[in-house]
Amino acid sequence: MTITRPDITASVPLLEPPGWALAERALFDLLDHAWRHFARDFTGPDGRLTYRDTLTSRDGADDFYEVFFNWPQLYLLGGADDLLAEAGRHWEGVTAQLTELGMLAGEYERGYDWFHQGESLLLLYFLTMADPARWAGRAVRFAELYVDPAHGNYDPVRRIIRRPHNGSDPD
């Protein structure tokens, strides 16, 4: 997917950066330190969260993704050059981890309410916004779970999602 961006040329000289811009850069530096510290201390080499237990209910998949969901946004705003790749690595690692814990099938929540699925998907949404060429295929595949009746979520006659707990394995 090719994105066309307009050329923008600055025409007003800037003698000194405004205070808000300096504060924003200081915040980005602080956030850069924070995400690196978190990744070093609380995740494994493949991006998984350090979690060695089992899950005892359907709830919880969203919590694994939520710690990373704003990393692509920070990257887009001017965060570290390696932040987007790290966010993707953590999505991959957490997705593998949750698959092993039985929470996902085909990289998607097996079946839970839409509110929690939406929380799980925030990271993917922002990864797709930041790097559509890499992530848009997954977004389309996941959307097909809700528009293709063969997946069991969508009832084309009534034009509704068939049950409150739905996903990649809704039955």
Region roles according to the model:
Residues 1-171:
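Glycan-recognition and catalytic cores of secretory/periplasmic carbohydrate-active enzymes
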